[in-house]
Amino acid sequence: MAIAVLGPTFLDLAENVESSVANISFIFVGRSMGYLGGSVLGGILFEQINQHLLLGISMLATAAGLFVVPWCKKAVLLTAVMSVVGMSMGFLDTGGNIIILNTWEDQAGPHIQALHFSFALGAFVAPILAKLALEFLPLDKKSFNVSEPFLEQSALPFGIKKSMLSYIVIGTYILLVSLFLFILFSKSRPRQSSGKASDDKFRTARYHNAVIFLLFLFFFCYVGAEVAYGSYIFTYAITYITNIENNYAAGLNSLFWGVFAAVRGLAICFATCLYPGTMLLLSVIGCTLSSLILVLFSRNHLLLWVGTAVYGASMATTFPSGFSWVQQYTTIGGKSASLFVVGAALGEMAIPASVGYLQGMFPNFPVLMYTALASSTMTAILFPVMYKLATAQQDQAQYNRVESDDRRALLSSSGMEEEDEDEAQNWNEADFETIEMNDQMKNSVTVISEDTPGNSAPSEILKHSTKSNGAEAAANKSPSRKHNTDREKND
């Protein structure tokens, strides 16, 4: 709501700062720059500081910025305030996706679809809220003793214009949300350091950086085409299609965003029974086919309505499904999530600006439809490449796991063989020592027997006894004997 409320109240803001629409157009640039800065900074801080605390601070900064907007009487001050609001929105987009991915991990599909549905719901509610603030404000000219025309311009205390009340209402709602986040932070346990995270919850694809960069380009094309189509479909219908009324063109615009929001709501249910990759593939196919129809039948009224509806429905689930899909193959941290948001923001700025410039140069050419087709073709090329790179880590990881097990088994078996060889060598040395001792004793007995012939019988007996004892000792000390003895003990 904080972002969408700017459109319906843009003329009121110009009047509030007493400037022209052209002079305050810089607030969009300021908000976009703040959004980019908040996305990058949030990606770094969300890995270091408690995530609920950062979300609470960002929501509090958003509420403060919206409260200050009605008192901004200078275009420069209004641009600075919008930069702060944009920065807090960058924090919110990055942090919201990170918290959901970290909390539900592989089951984050329905939850991240619900998050992005809330974005579409807020964009739908903001214009209605801005209109209701003017119609149901409980103030009248009698309470302030002012005339009817002046009541429409300044019917609130402190010089606040009545049209600025929507910023106060939305700011109050966001302030309450920030208080709940601070309460959640006070009840949450301290987060463990990333170094203590288990390996099961942290996985990295073999081509992690390549997948992240390609998904950055994917979101750049997707979000740029989405914003360009939603922004220029009304102008395209008025300028390019002949014999068309403003109500018809406005109906195309409402159809696109209405189907977009409705399908995002239905995607919460679809995500419970479909894989994120399946939903992303259906979105890519739907965008490609519908944009092709819009190019081939760019002047056909019926197919323009059908193509717009299908294109809006296909666009609805692409961004959240992309987050859920890549989380299945590689862990998405703060920096990666911020890179996705930055890519989307850059596409939101670059592609619509390019469409506007080219449409002015070639008014008789359907630039918008060809831009949609080019973006859809680019995403259709990027998705198979990303899938191939993301799934390559499964085969490689399995190969590395088998290879490490084999290497571990070989090392253990070689270690056992070396121990057996050392033990056998030691026993062989012991056998040789025993044989040498027997030879020495044999020689000594022989010498004695030669010197004393009369003692030949006892010498023979002693010689025979010595041989028997030596053989038994050698047999008892040999590995084979030891093995047989152990076997007998076991038996």
Curated annotation (Swiss-Prot):
Q: What does this protein do?
A: May function as a sodium-dependent glucose transporter. Potential channels for urea in the inner medulla of kidney.
What is the protein name for this chain?
Sodium-dependent glucose transporter 1
The UniProt regions of compositional bias labelled Acidic residues, in chain numbering, are 416-425
A Pfam match: MFS_1
The record's Gene Ontology biological-process terms are: sodium ion transport
- What UniProt keywords are attached to this protein's entry? Cell membrane, Ion transport, Membrane, Sodium, Sodium transport, Sugar transport, Symport, Transmembrane, Transmembrane helix, Transport
Q: Which species is the source of this protein?
A: Xenopus laevis (African clawed frog)
Can you cite an annotated GO cellular component? apical plasma membrane
Entries under PANTHER family matching the protein: SODIUM-DEPENDENT GLUCOSE TRANSPORTER 1
| Annotated transmembrane regions | 26-46, 52-72, 81-101, 119-139, 165-185, 210-230, 255-275, 277-297, 303-323, 338-358, 365-385
Write down the superkingdom of origin. Eukaryota
What InterPro entries does this protein's entry cite? MFS, MFS_trans_sf
